[in-house]
């Protein structure tokens, strides 16, 4: 974005929203951060706590406010809504968060009609679709956090397994941010070497079942964190920061954000995590990467899961 000051508003000051504000502040990505929450005192407390540390980072104004204070935001990040409790899946939250979004999105659009909307609340793929419909924005300006975090978890676990720097592990998790997501093994490599060849020629210590075990660990990662600490915050905040960074710096980075499919992969009219080129206008391109036949089948099945659940709410 070719402008001096970047204004980012965060709707929701819970664990994810407040940690996201901290991550953005630490990276120096905004000149102004506005935090909005139904619990105004909580939002004020978060803004105060963050503001007390601004002497240690690049100059930034951090305030708690109402929707009118978000006016002319460049990016609006929506983290508000009910989070999953232990034993719940993300899809269990559909109806509760749909009702919450009906109150949020029109207010955001009213004050920032040219903004890019970044949805983080769960179930993120469905709520991104809801935001797209409620906002009337073009699809490239309505983005979900998608499987950006899942992909990071996958890379981390593969790096741990192969005892290699995670930055040299290249792969994607695609589809729903949830239980029907798929691991794109056909695209997975370590410094250009397929995991099969790496295992056979270099690692030579694999127990053989990692291709089943690791994707399950990725799927269950959030649930395990929930069981232990009651919520997730740090990793998702860093994932959101990465998406925002790609937008603000017009990086043309490829990230597995939740994007609207219009026939790609034989899938129509659903948001899901797909490799997409991200820059200052939002989603610049949706990439159709070559998947195995089985992965294509699983991706379509993931889309069907999302469509079945989307049909539970009266969105038009």
From Swiss-Prot:
Intrachain disulfide bonds: none
CDD domains, per database record: LDH_2 (cd05292)
Regulation: Allosterically activated by fructose 1,6-bisphosphate (FBP).
EC id: 1.1.1.27
Gene Ontology molecular function: L-lactate dehydrogenase activity
Listed pathway(s): Fermentation; pyruvate fermentation to lactate; (S)-lactate from pyruvate: step 1/1
Active-site residue list: 177
SUPFAM superfamilies: LDH C-terminal domain-like, NAD(P)-binding Rossmann-fold domains
Assigned GO CC terms: cytoplasm
Principal EC category: oxidoreductase
Modified residues (Phosphotyrosine): 223
Cellular localization per UniProt: Cytoplasm
Subunit annotation: Homotetramer.
Catalytic activity: (S)-lactate + NAD(+) = pyruvate + NADH + H(+)
NCBIfam families in UniProt: L-LDH-NAD (TIGR01771), PRK00066.1 (NF000824), PRK06223.1 (NF004863)
Protein name: L-lactate dehydrogenase
Gene coding for it: ldh
A biological process from GO: lactate metabolic process
